[in-house]
UniProtKB/Swiss-Prot annotation:
This is tRNA-cytidine(32) 2-sulfurtransferase. Its cofactor is Mg(2+); [4Fe-4S] cluster. A motif (PP-loop motif) lies at residues 44-49. It holds the Pfam family ATP_bind_3. [4Fe-4S] cluster binds at residues 119, 122, 210. It is an enzyme of class 2 (transferase). The thiolation reaction likely consists of two steps: a first activation step by ATP to form an adenylated intermediate of the target base of tRNA, and a second nucleophilic substitution step of the sulfur (S) atom supplied by the hydrosulfide attached to the Fe-S cluster. GO terms for molecular function: 4 iron, 4 sulfur cluster binding; ATP binding; magnesium ion binding; sulfurtransferase activity; tRNA binding. It comes from Teredinibacter turnerae (strain ATCC 39867 / T7901). GO terms for biological process: tRNA thio-modification. Catalyzes the ATP-dependent 2-thiolation of cytidine in position 32 of tRNA, to form 2-thiocytidine (s(2)C32). The sulfur atoms are provided by the cysteine/cysteine desulfurase (IscS) system.
Amino acid sequence: MDQLTRKNRLEFNKLQKRLRRHVGRAIADYNMIEEGDRVMVCLSGGKDSYGMLDILLSLQRTAPVKFELVAVNLDQKQPGFPEHVLPAYLDTLDIEYHIVERDTYSIVKSVVPEGKTTCGLCSRLRRGTLYGFAEKIGATKIALGHHRDDIVETLFLNLFYAGRLKAMPPKLRSDDKRNIIIRPLAYCPEEDLEAFAQARAFPIIPCNLCGSQENLQRQVIKEMLRGWDKQFPGRVETIFAALQRVSPSQLADNALFNFTDLTLDRSAPAAIEDDAPLSWSDLATTEDTTDAVNIINAVNIG
């Protein structure tokens, strides 16, 4: 092994450990996988789902709980879809797998006008089929390959185009309460998954076989976030962290916080008494409005 190959191997090992750590932490933080779970891993043939399956198989060997993995691909009968690729790859792994055949492509083409993006309807049909199949095979969890950048992009898509503060949760119960969806890659940056897929030489299947243009709005958001992260490294990571530290009382949604019934309560002592000694650190660190008012009253400016 020459020096370059040795260096590449070291870099790959660091990347793999980082992704394993991200996935393991996400699973632990949201209790994604429990003892005896049968996890249906949705495999599209893209870099993210390949990476998710690879990492979950690796973690399965040393996990503190016993669980099963079942790989499932939905063949939507898109023209030119290479049907042999996924079975050939999965045959090399020690894993149960299923190829589900549903001609959702014809349905989408018959409903969506020519030139319009088919991604939305295609996604809904795919989701419905996978939910039903999960029940059929007794899966207790459905693992999807959305990563950290997908989650942040969805936040801004909803913010800019739908006027909603909404993203993708790492763990979700379906509306009919019959399925639990998990996103083990929730903490993983897309660039790490791209590098991992390249290093592992996964047989990637392109997502444009249907001829649909990539969702333009999502692409705009993706480019915006890439620009931000290039100019201000860590910006996307910080935005994701904000999704984990929400303060409902500092927003404006009456469904999350009862603004209507707010009342005064002066029974408790004030945070800062008028005659209490003050320091510059009091002025620098005070965030509560009540404290600020007391400080203004207490400090003799003139």
